[in-house]
UniProtKB/Swiss-Prot annotation:
Naturally occurring in which organism (per UniProt): Streptococcus thermophilus (strain ATCC BAA-250 / LMG 18311)
An annotated Gene Ontology molecular function: RNA endonuclease activity
Binding site for Zn(2+): 130, 134, 140
Gene: ybeY
Subcellular localization(s) per the UniProt record: Cytoplasm
UniProt protein name: Endoribonuclease YbeY
Cofactor note as given: Binds 1 zinc ion.
Length: 165
């Protein structure tokens, strides 16, 4: 999985960036999404607040904002068209590979790590996986959805080695 990583804060360590890349790749393999692309931007609470207001109409900072990429146009070609035009096939493959972007508030991650009594590394990993699952269609609006999403999220974090400490 290709992840474009941007640190708007200038405060995220190389270890956290590496962990985030590895964890997202691990989660992508688990979901069969290893050939996909996404972006992760680390932000402050102030920036998170702005984004939350812009995209979710919620006037407060949040820990992670997940923006799933859904192309406006549903473009399909039959196998014959793609076989006759290899450049088109390649272009469509690239078009389908981008799945979305995450904005992770490092301030919220620190606050929540302290509040929940685990490490900052664990919280950053949790937020990355949580956001990644949202981008891939998981949600927690109903008890059933929550059980499925939170179960998968815990399974990924535990298998990766980021347990609650």
């Amino acid at each position: 999985m290709y992840v474009e990583m941007i640190d708007e804060t200038g405060q995220v360590s190389e270890e956290i960036k590496k962990q985030t890349l590895e964890l997202l790749d691990f989660a992508a393999q688990k979901l069969g999404k290893k050939d996909k692309e996404m972006a992760v931007t680390f932000v402050t609470n102030e920036r998170s607040h702005e984004l939350n207001l812009e995209y979710r109409d919620t006037d407060r900072p949040t820990d992670v904002i997940s923006l799933e990429y859904k192309p406006e146009l549903d473009i399909t070609f039959d196998e014959e068209d793609l076989a006759e035009n290899p450049e088109l096939a390649e272009m469509m493959g690239e078009f389908d590979s981008y799945i979305g972007e995450l904005f992770i508030s490092i301030d919220k991650a620190r606050e929540q790590a302290e509040e929940y009594g685990h490490s900052y590394e664990r919280e950053m990993g949790f937020l990355a996986v949580h956001g990644f699952l949202h981008i891939n269609g998981y949600d927690h609006y109903t008890p059933e959805e929550e059980a499925e999403m939170f179960g998968l999220q815990e399974e990924i974090l535990t298998a990766y080695g980021l347990t609650r400490q």
